[in-house]
């Protein structure tokens, strides 16, 4: 259940808090050892998935500390230190954890590089044709069997309510709808929510969210319910919907898929989404590098992580 929920639930706490929060850390000296200890402690006290990952694949953050500390030398260059710290962060297997220097950014990519792409641009182009419609970044077409096809490649830009009304009204003659979010790397959670709410006629419980309240791996606040509410004065889709996903459906798209899975008349087909959960926080290391990581913890409707 934990694995399923971690993949299904996305970063929907960002609906409540936008932007990036910053954590003030204890003072460490600007040396390989000081930067190492600062980074390790930040993750140990603030990253929300350590206990989950210990249960999921045996991650032992204390052992990680011992193993990687052995690789430090007092004379190592900043580049060498960056490599060691990046490899240590990759043990978390989280694409939302990044180390950023003035000229480099670390990122865990195995969550999609090690799996089939499950997306063919040429096939998609054949479905869309040359005369497809577009509005607010959504590409849509009516297929020969009277099925609507909508491709949403990003949630970076906003989707206008009027544009959604226009799209859904035009597609109302169709027998069903295919909503393709493969290769959608995420973006604005408000945009993802705005699209999802057009597929329900009633307020739906989506899941729960809790916050880190202390340095312990299991110190969280009481879970708070998260709901999806439809705009009753807007056009809403009333027929069956299939949502297509792959490993590159990530971040805000992961949240979108989680919302859609809770709705009636919606079926999700495809590979597991890439994940990407929690509220992004940032901390600065003594050498000026910025550590980006996640803090809150999403839970499903049964209160399981």
Question: Which residues does each predicted region cover?
Answer:
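Bacterial Sec-dependent N-terminal signal peptides
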Residues: 1-29
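Short, well-structured beta-strand/strand-turn elements
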Residues: 250, 264-276
């Amino acid at each position: 259940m934990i694995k399923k929920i971690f993949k299904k639930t996305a970063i929907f706490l960002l609906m409540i808090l936008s932007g990036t929060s910053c954590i003030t850390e204890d003072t460490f000296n600007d040396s390989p050892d000081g930067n190492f200890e600062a980074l390790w402690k930040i993750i140990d006290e603030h990253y929300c998935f350590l206990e989950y990952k210990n249960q999921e694949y045996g991650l032992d953050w204390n052992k990680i500390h011992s193993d990687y500390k052995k690789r430090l030398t007092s004379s190592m260059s900043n580049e060498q230190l960056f490599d060691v710290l990046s490899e240590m962060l990759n043990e978390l297997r989280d694409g939302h954890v990044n180390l950023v220097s003035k000229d480099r950014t670390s990122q865990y990519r195995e969550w999609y590089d090690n799996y089939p792409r499950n997306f063919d641009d040429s096939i998609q182009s054949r479905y869309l044709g040359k005369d497809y419609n577009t509005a607010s970044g959504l590409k849509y077409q009516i297929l020969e069997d009277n099925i609507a096809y909508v491709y949403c490649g990003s949630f970076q830009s906003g989707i206008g309510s009027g544009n959604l009304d226009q799209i859904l009204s035009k597609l109302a003659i169709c027998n069903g709808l295919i909503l393709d979010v493969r290769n959608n790397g995420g973006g604005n959670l408000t945009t993802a929510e705005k699209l999802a709410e057009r597929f329900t006629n009633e307020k739906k419980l989506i899941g729960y969210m809790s916050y880190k309240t202390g340095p312990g791996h299991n110190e969280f606040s009481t879970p708070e319910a998260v709901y999806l509410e439809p705009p009753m004065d807007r056009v809403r889709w009333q027929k069956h919907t299939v949502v297509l996903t792959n490993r590159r459906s990530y971040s805000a798209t992961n949240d979108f898929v989680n919302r859609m899975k809770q709705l009636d008349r919606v079926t999700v087909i495809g590979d597991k989404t890439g994940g990407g959960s929690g509220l992004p926080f940032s901390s600065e290391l003594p050498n000026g590098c910025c550590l980006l990581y996640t803090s809150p913890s999403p839970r499903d409707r049964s209160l399981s992580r």
